[in-house]
Amino acid sequence: WVDRPATDDKVLVNLEAGKRYKIKVEYFDGGGDCFARLYWKAPDLDSRDRINLFGEAGKAAKECDITVAVLGIDKSIEREGQDRYTLELPADQQEFIREIYKINPKTVVVLVAGSSIAINWIDENIPAIIDAWYPGEQGGTAVAEALFGKYNPGGRLPLTFYNSMDELPPFDDYAVKKGRTYQYFTGKPLYEFGYGLSYTKFNYRKLNIASKQDTINIQFSISNTGKYDGDEVAQVYVQYPETGTYMPIKQLKGFKRVHIK
């Protein structure tokens, strides 16, 4: 059904090589928008054989100084009218990056996706991660310039990266106040809304808050304490006093991107 995650029904069937098998599919739509989809998973292979299925990836990882692994999803998994039933990467990609990491721990992961992905193992083990989103036909150039230092990244996440689906309410209940989005989520996310890194560091100081009638003016100073020029995105969030109503935990009220040498 379109108003909830897909139901994944599995059955174990023994198949013999060289034989043809007939598959009977019974489908019933009792109302609303419903669809069925069949998936095929290749027989389990040894992990090393699985690496070989990806061409020369395993060999290249052994020979290079640093491995850049591009992972993610595309419109075959998530698009308008089709939602994912899990926040994780496809199982073969999870196995792939684990094996690549064993071969060469100096690995960079580039994520390609249009939404958040639960990359818990990658976060714990891979030393560098860059989220490329869906970058377009010049995306490779943009990623390369960021990785090789020609461009110092300064982007910030426009959404929350959760650890798992267990942290979210049922898919068919999109009541935001039940823990959805950074405004109402009370747990500790994998990456929070507004999170982002660069090749330099910044320091905030001299915070001054002045109130005049219904207007609040906030001023502060930002200095670049690192070795490289870079962009910082200053963000101002507000929290509401107890009012008896279920107000957001916090809300973004202002932000500005500034380049600091």
PLM regions and their residue ranges:
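Intrinsically disordered, low-complexity Pro/Gly/Ser/Thr-rich segments with frequent PxxP/GP/PP motifs
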Residues: 244-261
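Acidic/polar, compositionally biased interaction segments
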Residues: 1-66, 81-83, 88-92, 247
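Secreted, periplasmic, or luminal enzymes acting at the cell surface/secretory milieu
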Residues: 112-231, 237-241
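Solvent-exposed, conformationally flexible loop/turn segments
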Residues: 18, 213, 260-261
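Hydrophobic helix-and-loop "lid/oligomerization" segment in the mid-to-C-terminal part
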Residues: 48-124
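Extended hydrophobic-aromatic, low-complexity segments
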Residues: 34-36, 78-80, 119-121, 228-233, ...
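Aromatic-lined ligand-binding clefts that engage carbohydrates, nucleic acids, or primary amines
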Residues: 23, 236-237
